[in-house]
Every structure is written in structure tokens, then in C-alpha cells.
UniProtKB/Swiss-Prot annotation:
Its EC number is 1.2.1.71. This is N-succinylglutamate 5-semialdehyde dehydrogenase. Pathway: Amino-acid degradation; L-arginine degradation via AST pathway; L-glutamate and succinate from L-arginine: step 4/5. Catalyzes the NAD-dependent reduction of succinylglutamate semialdehyde into succinylglutamate. The gene is astD.
Length: 485
């Protein structure tokens, strides 16, 4: 029973699907995908439930969400184990994600009050009131790299505002989605308020096509996000929020400070989660000259020592595998393509068992036209530069705009960088993947269109209703011209 529709666990009636551990190819979950007809049933159930759910007080909705938070805390180790088995991420990392699933709920509750609560004031004998109302039925598309807390950052704000949800997890991580749904069930969520539909492309297309949707919250690849954007063109009545990827630049100044700390920051930026974070550094700009050479030598030496292993291995690895063998092949093919264009591998990424790929670094300085692609894995491209102005110009040469960073102890360099760089998340002397939990997450260009994560998700889950109110109608002292009573 892999689908949760209208408060019932039902079997999918579509194609068989499995979840395979990418580190040993063991099947850890299996079921059948939802058909388009089942997706329509899920949307209809959400539509019916919306009429009741939106009428509950905020306190009543909040109580159920807080019950869910407690269930997450009680089951945090099992959540971490499931995510590790489905994604291959080290258990220390998935434990952090399980903690974030519960931790970000408090952010969403605060955001509801601060961004979409109710306010009133008196002006010229009128009561001016601002209220917020839910949109209706929201589709949430979850990613595989953070299958627990990223969907939660959409689902929780949607529910708090009074919306109902149809949730489609990534087909790579159905087990995590199913387990989270069971925790919502245990928390006392009424039937139909969240509906779970599992499946791959056909299920996703059916959900995006459903006529009963009022909004879509999507986290995933730029390619899929652009398809959704075209699909929703001409439908201004539907809210579409896209969180997509990036071809993220990291610029290292001559004034980078401590070399070991800089190397550590680069590794954390490029290879955390085996490079499978949308904010990971993809392009590293290093100054020409002796200092840059020495830094690269240190980076190469440290990269060769990175421990890559199964999620539960001891001693603990820094990196696990790619999400699938297809994803691993994509990284190796990208490396081969860059080599054919003139790139020189400083550390060659190599295939291991199952979906393992070791981290790779390739000097792409001599590539005439660097492909503007997101290589979603542990492949870092290095480009040498002559001046900070040139580095920033090269860094901005991308259709994406998610994250960027500068490593420099020089305040004037930082002022120039932050004034000229084009990105939504811009860090100084910190890893590119770091961001505050209540910061707007996203960027311009092909990286997305809104910032619908955790705190700022509140903006996209409710619409403002402005009212001017009086206790009774009134006659003015002077009528408008042309009116007689």
C-alpha cells in the first residue's frame, strides 16, 4: 500500500517501482506507482478536505503540526537510517537532516505570524484590516537529496495557512516520503489534508496537469522546473514556486588568509553530500601565480584523502555515493567531455562499486567556452584568473544564480564582490552550502522564481485580503457630484 489518498492506504495501480540503496544495490522499498486517475482522486480528496481544514482555527492546525514535530523527534533515528539507506549519505549527515525536519517547524510557525497573520488599524473612522487566506490545494514535489526536511519546508507552511496538499516525493526516495506520511497520520491529521502519490515521470505529469490545483511548490532540477514553467504559462491563477539548481562560482582571492582553512572551506563547498546539494560550488576561480599554485596543491592533496564509503562505515566517511548509477555515469561523462574540450584533471573522478564516484577536480582554464551546466555531483572545475574584476565577470557568466562565494580577508574586495555578483545566496569566507534556516533560499535566472522555503514559504501559501470596515453605512457631509437622494 504505497499511496495515501483520502485518509486510506491504497496500492498503486501503475508501474512497479523500487528504491535501491545506491551503495550496494539492495532493494529497500518496493511498490506500484499512482496512475493519473489515482492522482486525480488525490487532488479531489484534497479539495474536499480543504473546505473543512481551512475553517479550523490556526491553533487547531498548529496543534497537529506540533504533534507531527514530536513524532519526528521520537523517530529521528529511524528517519536518519531510512534516508541513509535510500540516498547513501553518511549517517552523521542524515541525522542532521532528521533534526532539521523538526527544527524548521518552529521557523514556519513564526513566519505565519510575522508574514501572514492578521493586523488592523484605524484611519479616518474606518477599520483597516489585513487578513490572509489560503490558496487551496497545493502540490509539493520533493527532491531526493534532502527527502525529509526540504518537502517539510513546503508542506508545513502550506498546512499552517489552511491549505491542503498532494505530495509527490522523488521516485528515488519513496520510502522517506511514505514514512513521513505515516508520522502525519499518527499526529492526527484529518483525512485528505495531505495525500501521498508515489511514482516517476507519468505521476508527476499527472499531478502538474491536475485541474484542481491552486499552486505548485517544486524543488528539483532546472530542466524539470522549466518544463513546469512552460506548462503553467497563461495560468496566472495558479501559484508556481520553483527551487532549482545552480552552476555556483566560488572565487578565491590572493588574500585568502589561512591556507588550510581555505582548503577546508572549498571541500565543504564542493564535495559535501557527494556534491549533491544545489548550492555546492561547481566552479572555483583561483588567482594565477605562486599563491594560487600552492593553494591548489594543498586542495589536491586533501581531496585525495577524502574518505568515500557506505553510510554506516567506520571510520565515518565524508562522502557517500551518487543517488544512482545513472547519476554516477553523468558525472563521469561530464568529466570526459571537459577533458575532450581541453580540461586537465588535477584529481580524476573514478567510478567505484554501485553508484560510487570519487571526487574530481579539473582545470578548465584552457576551455574556450565552458559549458554552463550543473554537474550535480563531486566534480569541481578550476579556472585561473588575473584580476578580481575578471573573476567576477567569469563567475557571472551563467544562466543560473543560486549561490556564490568569495574567500578574502580584504574588506574592499568583499564590497566589490557583493556589489557585482549575481546570486541569491552570497557568502564570504564560509562554505557556499551554508545559509540561515530563516533566510530566503533561491536565486535569479534559471535557479528559480520565488523563495518558498521554510520562513518565506508563508508568502506563497496565502494571499492577502485587505478590508476597509465600518459598523454601518454613512452619508458624507458633501455628496459626490451628480448624486441626489
Amino acid at each position: 500500500m504505497t499511496q495515501w489518498i483520502a485518509g486510506q492506504w491504497v496500492a498503486g495501480q501503475g508501474d512497479a517501482m523500487t528504491s535501491v540503496s545506491p551503495y550496494n544495490n539492495e532493494v529497500v522499498w518496493q511498490g506500484d506507482s499512482a496512475t493519473p486517475a489515482q492522482v486525480e482522486s488525490a487532488v479531489a480528496a484534497a479539495r474536499d478536505a480543504f473546505l473543512v481544514w481551512k475553517k479550523l482555527s490556526f491553533a487547531e492546525r498548529e496543534a497537529i503540526v506540533l504533534n507531527f514535530a514530536e513524532k519526528v523527534k521520537e523517530n529521528s533515528e529511524e528517519i536518519a537510517q531510512i534516508i541513509a539507506k535510500e540516498t547513501g549519505k553518511p549517517i552523521w549527515e542524515t541525522r542532521t537532516e532528521a533534526g532539521a525536519m523538526a527544527g524548521k517547524i518552529a521557523i514556519s510557525i513564526r513566519a505565519y505570524h510575522e508574514r501572514t497573520g492578521e493586523a488592523s488599524r484605524e484611519a479616518a473612522g474606518n477599520q483597516i484590516v489585513l487578513r490572509h487566506r489560503p490558496l487551496g490545494v497545493m502540490a509539493v514535489f520533493g527532491p531526493y537529496n534532502f527527502p525529509g526536511h526540504l518537502p517539510n519546508g513546503h508542506i508545513v507552511p502550506a498546512l499552517l495557512s489552511g491549505n491542503t496538499v498532494v505530495f509527490k516525493p522523488s521516485e528515488q526516495t519513496p520510502w522517506t516520503g511514505e514514512f513521513a506520511m505515516k508520522l502525519w497520520q499518527e499526529a492526527g491529521l484529518p483525512a485528505g489534508v495531505i495525500n501521498l502519490v508515489q511514482g516517476a515521470k507519468e505521476t508527476g505529469i499527472a499531478l502538474a496537469d491536475a485541474k484542481g490545483l491552486d499552486g505548485v511548490l517544486f524543488t528539483g532540477s532546472a530542466n524539470t522546473g522549466h518544463i513546469l514553467h512552460r506548462q503553467f504559462a497563461g495560468q496566472p491563477g495558479k501559484m508556481l514556486a520553483l527551487e532549482m539548481g545552480g552552476n555556483n562560482p566560488m572565487v578565491i582571492s590572493d588574500q585568502f588568509g589561512d591556507a588550510d582553512a581555505t582548503v577546508y572551506t572549498i571541500i565543504q563547498s564542493a564535495f559535501i553530500s557527494a556534491g549533491q546539494r544545489c548550492t555546492c560550488a561547481r566552479r572555483l576561480y583561483v588567482p594565477v601565480g605562486e599563491k594560487g599554485d600552492q593553494l591548489l596543491d594543498k586542495l589536491v592533496a586533501a581531496t585525495l584523502k577524502i574518505r568515500v564509503d557506505q553510510p554506516f562505515a567506520e571510520p565515518a566517511p565524508f562522502m557517500g555515493p551518487q543517488i544512482s548509477e545513472a547519476a554516477a555515469k553523468f558525472i563521469l561523462d561530464a568529466q570526459a567531455n571537459l577533458q575532450s574540450l581541453g580540461g586537465v584533471s588535477l584529481v580524476e573522478a573514478k567510478a567505484g562499486e554501485a553508484a560510487f564516484v570519487s571526487p574530481g577536480i579539473i582545470d578548465a582554464t584552457n576551455i574556450a567556452e565552458l559549458p554552463d551546466e550543473e554537474y550535480f555531483g563531486p566534480l569541481l572545475q578550476v579556472v585561473r584568473y588575473q584580476s578580481l574584476e575578471q573573476a567576477v565577470e567569469l563567475a557571472n557568466d551563467t544562466r543560473f544564480g543560486l549561490s556564490a562565494g568569495l574567500v578574502s580577508t580584504d574588506d574592499s574586495e568583499w564590497e566589490y564582490f557583493v556589489d557585482h555578483i549575481r546570486a541569491g545566496i552570497v557568502n564570504r569566507n564560509r562554505q557556499l552550502t551554508g545559509a540561515s534556516g530563516d533566510a530566503p533560499f533561491g536565486g535569479p535566472g534559471a535557479s528559480g522564481n520565488l523563495r518558498p522555503s521554510a520562513y518565506y514559504a508563508a508568502d506563497y501559501c496565502a494571499y492577502p485580503m485587505a478590508s476597509m470596515e465600518g459598523g454601518e453605512t454613512q452619508l458624507p457631509a458633501t455628496f459626490s457630484p451628480g448624486i441626489e437622494l
